[in-house]
Amino acid sequence: LLSGEVAPASSERASWFARLLALSRLALAEQRLPHTNAGPLSRREMAALARLNPSMGLMLEGLGAAYDALHRRAPSKRLDVRLAQLEQAGRLGVPFTTGLLLGVGETWDQRRDALRLLADMQRRRGHLQEVILQPWRPGGASARPLSPPEQADLLEVISLARRELPPEIHLQTPPNLWPWEALPAALEAGIDDLGGIDAVDVINPAYPQPLPE
């Protein structure tokens, strides 16, 4: 369940959260397993959703000034907030998916440090099930697939992630951002999950899902 975030102090927060619970129950009634990513949650909210969701998620995004600048008007995306959420999920024992947003101006060392931070958290808490390696793409109506240099860079990040993260953590990258013929290279580098393949990618709607013959 993906949702727009509602500020903790908002008068709409209670009804928003009640809807998340109701949709989780509906998914279970339809014999589906919900996975909620709804932004930062209080301990009480996360614990309540965890009783209905086999797993949950929230992107770490990354470390460094590039992310601070990107999210300067989004307080819920501050690094300390995101890290606190990952730690809270670990204390509650919630199986969790997180990830990095790549290509926003971060350095190679910052990528490595973010992966090592997640690896350390996994060794302490044991709750991280998957890390998404999400290349940033420009919005708008026109898609711009990864260029060959961008593909090569992402393959290096995948290989780095596979070396730095514990082996039980799965690695995901969105298949619609790659040329179809280049996906085998991503799998060889360490990707073992191509994520959700829906009719429309809600994160990158201008990028159609691959339709191999």
What kind of region is each of these model predictions?
Residues L1-M121:
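Conserved Radical SAM active-site core
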Residues R112-E213:
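Auxiliary Fe-S-binding modules of radical SAM enzymes
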